[in-house]
Amino acid sequence: MQDEYYMARALKLAQRGRFTTHPNPNVGCVIVKDGEIVGEGYHQRAGEPHAEVHALRMAGEKAKGATAYVTLEPCSHHGRTPPCCDALIAAGVARVVASMQDPNPQVAGRGLYRLQQAGIDVSHGLMMSEAEQLNKGFLKRMRTGFPYIQLKLGASLDGRTAMASGESQWITSPQARRDVQLLRAQSHAILTSSATVLADDPALTVRWSELDEQTQALYPQQNLRQPIRIVIDSQNRVTPVHRIVQQPGETWFARTQEDSREWPETVRTLLIPEHKGHLDLVVLMMQLGKQQINSIWVEAGPTLAGALLQAGLVDELIVYIAPKLLGSDARGLCTLPGLEKLADAPQFKFKEIRHVGPDVCLHLVGA
């Protein structure tokens, strides 16, 4: 039970990095000697010291003969920072308990093997499902080359997203919109369509003022990382004056042809081929994976939502349901043309159901 207690602490520490570590994974480390925590830390940003280094610095000489609990296999390769294995070995740690092996081919068990070769008692697998859930985007990209895609939808009880006129502000409650801010902040990128930009002129930023007090305390406003905004714009309809281009952070456009207009330095273009007359979403996701994008939060209209679902690219649905009815003339949730049989419908299973103010939030994953 002691091992579980300390690993749970390491996982809690790792969660603190979920807004800032991209493209790196979230990692926490706790160092224990004689039943006392002598050092702890978590990875805060890519290029900065890893969790083990922070914990070892805190532990100092007390790390000798201690046990290190780490949520991810310590790295053994030289990246932007030195290998954590070397630091653990040099500190004289006697035992290392890792929650999960690193799926990164550069590590992939080599870290644990190196520690064993140095005479350290090594084990892994403790609370592995919790560690994998914390790094689902990193894991998906390492294993498949694709980012983890969360599709956010907001609807009425009868599955409608807007009135026939297009009026949609606001179907869901202020509490639901604040909840969205937190989930946006945890994402590496936010994806939308040119149709949504033209219709709503959204900023698609994380608004620090709408985050909960605990998150604000951990992350002062000046440390807030804005997710990369990605716009699918195959016809080059979005202009440099749209709000999404003017916000802090980067805006990427997925296009099928170059755009010759003058854009701010924070704008980047990805040229993607067409497939059946539309921008190829599968190729786009492959390209984003190559750009080390771990996770994508999608906020778009029914056309892009439906296209992602039909392409089998959605890993998780997050649906906010408001307790109101909009009627049969209102706009639907997703455009899924060509569905004739129930067997052809995209299938999901419920993962979590929670109340958010007066609304309900459904979390669903692929069946």
UniProtKB/Swiss-Prot annotation:
Its EC number is 3.5.4.26, 1.1.1.193. The active site is at E52 (proton donor). Substrate binds at S168, R184, L204, R207, E299. Keywords: Hydrolase, Metal-binding, Multifunctional enzyme, NADP, Oxidoreductase, Riboflavin biosynthesis, Zinc. Residues 146-367 are annotated as: Reductase. Pathway: Cofactor biosynthesis; riboflavin biosynthesis; 5-amino-6-(D-ribitylamino)uracil from GTP: step 2/4; Cofactor biosynthesis; riboflavin biosynthesis; 5-amino-6-(D-ribitylamino)uracil from GTP: step 3/4. Residues 1-123 form the CMP/dCMP-type deaminase domain. NADP(+) binds at T161, A162, M163, A164, W170, T196, D200, S234, G301, P302, T303, L304. Zn(2+) binds at H50, C75, C84. Pfam families: dCMP_cyt_deam_1, RibD_C. GO terms for biological process: riboflavin biosynthetic process. Its cofactor is Zn(2+). Binds 1 zinc ion. GO terms for molecular function: 5-amino-6-(5-phosphoribosylamino)uracil reductase activity; diaminohydroxyphosphoribosylaminopyrimidine deaminase activity; NADP binding; zinc ion binding. In the N-terminal section; belongs to the cytidine and deoxycytidylate deaminase family. In the C-terminal section; belongs to the HTP reductase family. NCBIfam families: eubact_ribD, PRK10786.1, ribD_Cterm. Homodimer. This is Riboflavin biosynthesis protein RibD. It comes from Escherichia coli (strain K12). The gene is ribD.
